[in-house]
């Protein structure tokens, strides 16, 4: 008997210890910052029972600050028994601003049709709006919504849950959903349920969810207009680019995609595919306004001859040797820095506004047709022939003409002043191997500066020659230093139907590079300002 009692006591002791350990483990488990209500509320007369009961649970959820979601929306007014108080409205001289839960009478019954936090109130808690058949849109940004269930919301048209710590979302049987935005969350490949049911989707944005590695868009890729999977882990098996016939905008930056074939796209307007290891990028034949950013992808060639509507390209940091824009008459912005360019053909691009082609292997560049070119940077090349002629009603007329005898190079560049953050514009003289820079002189041989980098003021007229001599040669004797010829005012623009023919200056004597500037337009610091012009 005593042995039996000892066994019972031992078993009870073990059970107590196990229970204590279990309670301790439970206490250490992470808990949500919010608490869902367990109270029961009767559905008000005239309101759909499913809609009210699903939504009142969310409205009664207490957030991490100890405030119910309903109170966060409409402080001091919210009552769970009156759904009309779940919406906050304020009148302004320009109109009414409102956010919260929207109801609408449909077939004699009030139905939940929309939820919007208006960017201004932080809502927290899990969402279960399943079978709310007339729910049309949900907009929640900057909230804390770990999970969301919209299954069988047959009228759901748009979901926007961004930067909300979302880990799982169910959109099963949401047959009419057109827009699915769930970017900046914690979704993984298994966290999106039912996407294959959403055959009407035209806008898909799941960017900034690095754990998404598999994504099946085959149910709606043919009618997609906007696709953004930036900063996700998806790869080549997830997107068939040849099926994206209707797409307007694509962003696949920072993914694992290596092959992009857009040749079947008929109306693409924006393609962003930078910072990923591309094997190739095949562009469509289309005349739509198009901007492309494919910087830092490793592509070795880029054929834009079929993109007649191309107006902006950034292909910097790629080993591309040739770019030809002769079939791109609407080209306005070219950024091709730190490539291996040997040829940059801009003939006929008379709408150019900015060209950056720094640190390449260019020996010549023709921008003479660009009468609106206000920003031109070409340092770090071996340019021997530059003609920059601007003639428009905003900037007036100015010319930069450069001819080289083969012993030095001249470039136009800028840097940002670290103190004022303004632009420092300069002409730069770089001697070839075996030569040295002597000075800048005017056309009469008067010395202007001995600094190879000469800072200039935009929209003033300059006539300068960069003098180079072989190493070891005797110094060149010049007149006393003089200031360059600067006009008081920029020349008035010459408005003609056709661009005026450039006047080629006399070729300087051997040992000099001539730089003739009749006024230079203002050049802004920083990157190119994107200015899209319709045509």
Where do the protein language model's features map onto the residues?
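N-terminal capping/linker segments that flank leucine-rich repeat
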Residues: 8-13, 26-137, 175, 199, ...
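Sec-dependent signal peptide cleavage junction
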Residues: 22-38, 505-513, 530
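Concave beta-strand-loop units of leucine-rich repeat
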Residues: 116-123, 139-145, 155, 160-165, ...
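Canonical leucine-rich repeat
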Residues: 126-127, 148, 169, 190-195, ...
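Surface-exposed interfaces of beta-sheet-rich extracellular modules
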Residues: 423-451
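Solvent-exposed segments in extracellular or luminal domains encompassing
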Residues: 452-462
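C-terminal low-complexity, Ser/Thr- and acidic/Pro-rich disordered "stalk" regions positioned immediately N-terminal
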Residues: 469-509
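A cross-kingdom C-terminal cell-surface attachment/processing module
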Residues: 513-533
């Amino acid at each position: 008997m005593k042995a039996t009692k000892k066994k019972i006591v031992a078993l009870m002791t073990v059970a107590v210890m196990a229970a204590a350990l279990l309670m301790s483990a439970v206490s250490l488990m992470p808990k949500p910052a919010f608490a869902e209500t367990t109270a029961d509320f009767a559905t008000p007369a005239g309101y759909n029972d499913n809609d009210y009961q699903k939504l009142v649970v969310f409205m009664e959820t207490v957030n991490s600050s100890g405030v119910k979601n309903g109170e966060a929306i409409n402080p001091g007014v919210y009552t769970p028994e009156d759904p009309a108080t779940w919406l906050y409205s304020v009148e302004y001289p320009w109109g009414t601003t409102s956010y919260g839960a929207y109801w609408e009478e449909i077939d004699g019954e009030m139905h939940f049709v929309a939820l919007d936090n208006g960017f201004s109130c932080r809502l927290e808690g899990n969402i279960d709006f399943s079978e709310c058949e007339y729910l049309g849109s949900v907009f929640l940004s900057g909230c804390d919504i770990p999970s969301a269930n919209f299954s069988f919301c047959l009228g759901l048209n748009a979901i926007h849950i961004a930067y909300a710590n979302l880990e799982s979302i169910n959109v099963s049987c949401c047959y009419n959903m057109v827009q699915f935005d769930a970017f900046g969350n914690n979704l993984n490949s298994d966290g999106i349920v039912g996407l294959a049911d959403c055959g009407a989707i035209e806008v898909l944005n799941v960017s900034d969810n690095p754990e998404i590695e598999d994504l099946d868009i085959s149910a709606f890729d043919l009618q997609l207009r906007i696709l953004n999977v930036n900063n996700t882990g998806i790869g080549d098996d997830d997107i068939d680019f040849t099926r994206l016939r209707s797409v307007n905008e694509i962003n696949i930056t920072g993914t694992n995609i290596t092959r992009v074939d857009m040749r079947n796209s008929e109306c693409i307007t924006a393609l962003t595919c930078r910072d990923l290891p591309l094997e190739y990028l095949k562009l469509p034949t289309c005349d739509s306004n198009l901007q492309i950013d494919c910087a830092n992808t490793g592509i070795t060639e880029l054929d834009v001859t079929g993109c007649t509507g191309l107006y902006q390209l950034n292909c910097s940091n790629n080993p591309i040797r040739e770019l030809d824009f002769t079939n791109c008459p609407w080209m306005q912005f070219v950024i091709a820095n730190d490539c291996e360019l040997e040829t940059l053909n801009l003939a006929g691009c008379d709408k150019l506004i900015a060209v950056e082609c720094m640190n390449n292997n260019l020996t010549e560049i023709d921008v003479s047709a660009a009468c609106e070119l206000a920003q031109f940077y070409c340092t770090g090349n071996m340019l021997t022939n530059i003609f920059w002629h601007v003639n428009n009603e905003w900037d007036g007329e100015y010319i930069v003409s450069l001819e080289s005898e083969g012993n030095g190079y001249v470039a136009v560049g800028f840097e940002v002043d670290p103190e004022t953050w303004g632009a420092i514009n300069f002409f730069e003289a770089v001697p070839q191997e075996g030569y040295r820079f002597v000075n800048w002189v005017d056309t009469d041989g008067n010395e202007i500066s001995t600094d190879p980098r000469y800072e200039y003021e935009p929209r003033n007229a300059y006539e300068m020659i960069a003098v180079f001599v072989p190493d070891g040669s005797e110094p060149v004797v010049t007149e006393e230093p003089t200031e360059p010829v600067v006009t008081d005012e920029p020349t008035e623009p010459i408005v003609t139907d056709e661009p005026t023919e450039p006047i080629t200056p006399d070729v300087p004597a051997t040992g000099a590079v001539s730089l003739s500037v009749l006024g230079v337009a203002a050049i802004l610091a920083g990157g190119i300002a994107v200015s899209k012009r319709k045509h």
